[in-house]
From Swiss-Prot:
InterPro entries: Trypano_VSG_B_N_dom (IPR025932). Residues 1-22 form the signal peptide. It holds the Pfam family VSG_B. The lineage of its organism: Eukaryota, Discoba, Euglenozoa, Kinetoplastea, Metakinetoplastina. Residues 380-413 form a propeptide. VSG forms a coat on the surface of the parasite. The trypanosome evades the immune response of the host by expressing a series of antigenically distinct VSGs from an estimated 1000 VSG genes. Keywords: Cell membrane, Glycoprotein, GPI-anchor, Lipoprotein, Membrane, Signal, Trypanosomiasis. It comes from the Eukaryota. It is found in: Cell membrane. Its main location: membrane. Glycans are attached at residues 91, 361, 379. This is Variant surface glycoprotein YnAT 1.3.
Length: 413
């Protein structure tokens, strides 16, 4: 049996070991997850904000657009003798008026056709706006990741990481007085993730973000042997494998921004030692009074320093791109709502055209409908185009009058 002294020593050792493990786990894991969230949103947007995806969101609910369906009604009206098939229902036909009443009915349908065409043109314009805003949001998200404009996200991201090759880490991971050649903090998510997660040596802080990042190389403070592009590949793989459920929506991105901003200064110790020096640190530091974020020790900081030339937060370019993406997504959503509203208006015009045919049938005494198979209805794919005439609006049919003729597709409106 162990004596009390040895037992206490073992317990104490286990406590210290557990504390060490916890410290290793918590250091920059939350910060990595926060920035990784924006990267994963961007990767999802690469597939979800394409032209095909935006088109699928604005297709006609009933398949064929109302203009085409009204054209078919006009074609059948002109080519049928006394009965016409209504809509796409094979067993529904109605009797047609003859002579002048038939011509007046045709002119009514042409007025509805003109209205449908105008409304559908507005639909097409709004659909184009949806696609444009999708492309804009996608481009902003990709530039947030890479700090560069370009069609290939992963190639641009690797190039952004390679730009850190041989750069002094203590300078590159600061934003104060940012210049293209030396200061990279805040310019891209790639740069900030490198500052948070790249090991400084093969043995120092190699699990700082919760995964081993040094297998493909290290990023020393002097910038030598950094292999930045390979380290980024390791970080990107870890991000892709991180179980984070993301959405490409304004609401989700706003929440992600709030979480990111809540981490600023969260791990900067001794904030009172030098005013507000550690308030804008992202990542781990034991000494906010003289932070270098050079990765050489926990005291110096394995972090990103967003402090500007004064104690205020400096510019974070990638965050600006995320906010621009939010605006683009909000405009996309507004245009989606406009598309759907206009589509409902166009479909209502189609219903009015069909109601005009029903009204004509009722005016003839509401003859019983007969199966279409008993009526020869020519099928023309080239409807005659005519100039629209100015006519009076069709009279609205009372609900009581059309109740016996409830059409299956009207239940979809």
């Amino acid at each position: 049996m162990l004596d009390n002294s040895r037992a206490r020593s073992i317990v104490h050792l286990l406590i210290l070991l557990k504390a060490h493990v916890i410290t290793q786990i918590i250091k920059n894991t939350q910060e990595f997850t926060s920035l990784c969230t924006f990267v994963k949103v961007t990767l999802k947007a690469t597939d979800g904000l394409t032209s095909a995806a935006s088109k699928s969101q604005t297709d006609w609910a009933l398949g064929e657009n109302p203009t085409s369906r009204i054209k078919k009604l006009i074609t059948e009206l002109e080519t049928s003798s006394d009965r016409i098939r209504l809509g796409e229902e094979p067993n529904l036909t109605i009797q047609l008026p003859q002579g002048d009443p038939k011509q007046r009915l045709r002119r009514k349908l042409e007025v509805f056709l003109a209205r449908a065409k105008y409304t559908e043109e507005l639909v097409r314009q709004a659909q184009g706006d949806v696609g444009g805003r999708c492309n804009e949001a996608k481009a902003e998200l990709e530039e947030a990741v890479t700090g560069r404009k370009g069609p290939d996200l992963e190639t641009q991201a690797t190039a952004a990481a390679a730009a850190l090759h041989n750069k002094a880490r203590g300078t590159a991971c600061k934003v104060a007085g940012a210049t293209t050649d030396t200061n990279f903090a805040g310019t891209s998510l790639v740069a900030d993730l490198m500052c948070l997660c790249a090991a400084e040596t093969n043995s120092r802080e190699k699990h700082i973000c919760g995964f081993e990042s040094h297998a493909s190389g290290v990023w020393a403070n002097a910038g030598t042997n950094s292999n930045a592009g390979e380290i980024w590949g390791k970080i990107l793989d870890a991000c892709k494998n991180r179980e984070i459920q993301v959405e490409v929506t304004p609401q989700f991105l706003r929440i992600a921004i709030t979480k990111f901003e809540g981490l600023l200064g969260a791990q900067a110790h001794k904030l009172t030692s030098n005013g507000n020096a550690g308030a804008w640190l992202l990542g781990y530091s034991m000494n906010a009074g003289s932070v270098t974020c050079d990765g050489q020790s926990s005291t110096n900081g394995i972090c990103v320093d967003y402090k500007g030339s004064s104690d205020a937060r400096g510019p974070i370019a990638w965050l600006g791109h995320i906010k621009n993406a939010i605006t683009a997504l909000e405009n996309r959503d507004k245009n989606l709502q406009r598309v759907r509203k206009l589509q409902r208006q166009a479909e209502a015009i189609l219903m009015s055209a069909e109601d005009a045919l029903i009204e004509a049938n009722i005016s003839l005494g509401g003859k019983d409908m007969v199966p279409a198979s008993e009526v020869t209805v020519p099928n023309s794919s080239n409807p005659t185009s005519r100039q629209n005439s100015v006519v009076q609006e069709p009279t609205t049919v009372s609900a009581a009058a059309i109740t016996p003729l409830i059409l299956p597709w009207t239940l979809l409106i």
